[in-house]
Amino acid sequence: MVGFKATDVPPTATVKFLGAGTAACIADLITFPLDTAKVRLQIQGESQGLVRTAASAQYRGVLGTILTMVRTEGPRSLYNGLVAGLQRQMSFASVRIGLYDSVKQFYTKGSEHAGIGSRLLAGSTTGALAVAVAQPTDVVKVRFQAQARAGGGRRYQSTVEAYKTIAREEGIRGLWKGTSPNVARNAIVNCAELVTYDLIKDTLLKANLMTDDLPCHFTSAFGAGFCTTVIASPVDVVKTRYMNSALGQYHSAGHCALTMLRKEGPRAFYKGFMPSFLRLGSWNVVMFVTYEQLKRALMAAYQSREAPF
């Protein structure tokens, strides 16, 4: 057995909620530069943006984007928006991942045998609910990642200032900009990510190919990351473009998608695919492995605390 052993008592909803948020923050700390590179590649090619996005710099590939940012803006630019990113994960992942099992049990009325329909419904529900809670943090994160440090063109100097500036200049609705594509994206992401992880893990365990241990969690998470990237990339690119756009640049998320298609062609919807996959694949591995271990560690600590002397 590698890592913490599974406990006799299943993890509580609170343990899952806190464990998911904490694990997601750890995953973000490790993979954030890849996410920033993804955002820069996704917005490349826009004729207009809300914040200065180093238009003179041409990004080519994941490594090229990272090296260009380090050379022109410094290493810290790779972590632009990290504070908002951690705020997002603590509120976002806690809901979409931490509540997934509880919502799945609700739809199956407590049955241990959840069908694919119940899993998809649970994933869509928690994904959409998480967006409603965490959208402002996502908007601020994307704005920070998109803006360049070089040449004094930074629009926001701090996370708190970003929230205030957006609310003052664009209204409260500005903080929920891009909610529609984000709801669509996260319903898709959650279904692809959690359901695929669920199914791969169940298949490996039922076929006795692996035990419920780190290698099983690693394999399931990596497979889920690849499937999710393929399915969700088009919506993710539209979401990023729309949230980073200037006031009035796009009338809606649909208008943003049509503009991309007309000006840049279908391939624009898969801009930043490689950093998306590298980020989502590695993020999934770190998050799910950490999440599984945190659940076991927290329940072991809880049981030892409750155990009689």
UniProtKB/Swiss-Prot annotation:
<dbReference type="InterPro" id="IPR018108">
    <property type="entry name" value="Mitochondrial_sb/sol_carrier"/>
</dbReference>
<dbReference type="GO" id="GO:0015108">
    <property type="term" value="F:chloride transmembrane transporter activity"/>
</dbReference>
<dbReference type="GO" id="GO:0019003">
    <property type="term" value="F:GDP binding"/>
</dbReference>
<dbReference type="GO" id="GO:0031966">
    <property type="term" value="C:mitochondrial membrane"/>
</dbReference>
<dbReference type="Pfam" id="PF00153">
    <property type="entry name" value="Mito_carr"/>
</dbReference>
<feature type="topological domain" description="Mitochondrial matrix">
    <location>
        <begin position="41"/>
        <end position="77"/>
    </location>
</feature>
<dbReference type="GO" id="GO:1990542">
    <property type="term" value="P:mitochondrial transmembrane transport"/>
</dbReference>
<keyword id="KW-0812">Transmembrane</keyword>
<dbReference type="GO" id="GO:0000266">
    <property type="term" value="P:mitochondrial fission"/>
</dbReference>
<feature type="topological domain" description="Mitochondrial intermembrane">
    <location>
        <begin position="295"/>
        <end position="309"/>
    </location>
</feature>
<dbReference type="InterPro" id="IPR050391">
    <property type="entry name" value="Mito_Metabolite_Transporter"/>
</dbReference>
<feature type="transmembrane region" description="Helical; Name=1">
    <location>
        <begin position="17"/>
        <end position="40"/>
    </location>
</feature>
<keyword id="KW-0813">Transport</keyword>
<dbReference type="GO" id="GO:0071333">
    <property type="term" value="P:cellular response to glucose stimulus"/>
</dbReference>
<dbReference type="GO" id="GO:0015297">
    <property type="term" value="F:antiporter activity"/>
</dbReference>
<dbReference type="GO" id="GO:0110099">
    <property type="term" value="P:negative regulation of calcium import into the mitochondrion"/>
</dbReference>
<protein>
    <recommendedName>
        <fullName>Dicarboxylate carrier UCP2</fullName>
    </recommendedName>
</protein>
<dbReference type="GO" id="GO:0097421">
    <property type="term" value="P:liver regeneration"/>
</dbReference>
<feature type="topological domain" description="Mitochondrial matrix">
    <location>
        <begin position="243"/>
        <end position="268"/>
    </location>
</feature>
<feature type="transmembrane region" description="Helical; Name=5">
    <location>
        <begin position="218"/>
        <end position="242"/>
    </location>
</feature>
<dbReference type="GO" id="GO:0015183">
    <property type="term" value="F:L-aspartate transmembrane transporter activity"/>
</dbReference>
<dbReference type="GO" id="GO:0015131">
    <property type="term" value="F:oxaloacetate transmembrane transporter activity"/>
</dbReference>
<dbReference type="GO" id="GO:0006541">
    <property type="term" value="P:glutamine metabolic process"/>
</dbReference>
<feature type="repeat" description="Solcar 1">
    <location>
        <begin position="11"/>
        <end position="106"/>
    </location>
</feature>
<comment type="subunit">
    <text>Homotetramer. Adopts an asymmetrical dimer of dimers functional form. Interacts with MICU1 (when methylated); leading to decrease the calcium sensitivity of MICU1.</text>
</comment>
<dbReference type="GO" id="GO:0072593">
    <property type="term" value="P:reactive oxygen species metabolic process"/>
</dbReference>
<dbReference type="GO" id="GO:0061179">
    <property type="term" value="P:negative regulation of insulin secretion involved in cellular response to glucose stimulus"/>
</dbReference>
<feature type="transmembrane region" description="Helical; Name=2">
    <location>
        <begin position="78"/>
        <end position="103"/>
    </location>
</feature>
<feature type="transmembrane region" description="Helical; Name=3">
    <location>
        <begin position="120"/>
        <end position="145"/>
    </location>
</feature>
<feature type="repeat" description="Solcar 2">
    <location>
        <begin position="114"/>
        <end position="203"/>
    </location>
</feature>
<dbReference type="GO" id="GO:0015140">
    <property type="term" value="F:malate transmembrane transporter activity"/>
</dbReference>
<dbReference type="GO" id="GO:0140787">
    <property type="term" value="F:phosphate ion uniporter activity"/>
</dbReference>
<dbReference type="InterPro" id="IPR002067">
    <property type="entry name" value="Mit_carrier"/>
</dbReference>
<dbReference type="GO" id="GO:0030225">
    <property type="term" value="P:macrophage differentiation"/>
</dbReference>
<keyword id="KW-0496">Mitochondrion</keyword>
<feature type="topological domain" description="Mitochondrial intermembrane">
    <location>
        <begin position="104"/>
        <end position="119"/>
    </location>
</feature>
<dbReference type="GO" id="GO:0015740">
    <property type="term" value="P:C4-dicarboxylate transport"/>
</dbReference>
<keyword id="KW-0472">Membrane</keyword>
<dbReference type="GO" id="GO:0042803">
    <property type="term" value="F:protein homodimerization activity"/>
</dbReference>
<comment type="function">
    <text>Antiporter that exports dicarboxylate intermediates of the Krebs cycle in exchange for phosphate plus a proton across the inner membrane of mitochondria, a process driven by mitochondrial motive force with an overall impact on glycolysis, glutaminolysis and glutathione-dependent redox balance. Continuous export of oxaloacetate and related four-carbon dicarboxylates from mitochondrial matrix into the cytosol negatively regulates the oxidation of acetyl-CoA substrates via the Krebs cycle lowering the ATP/ADP ratio and reactive oxygen species (ROS) production.</text>
</comment>
<keyword id="KW-0677">Repeat</keyword>
<dbReference type="GO" id="GO:0015909">
    <property type="term" value="P:long-chain fatty acid transport"/>
</dbReference>
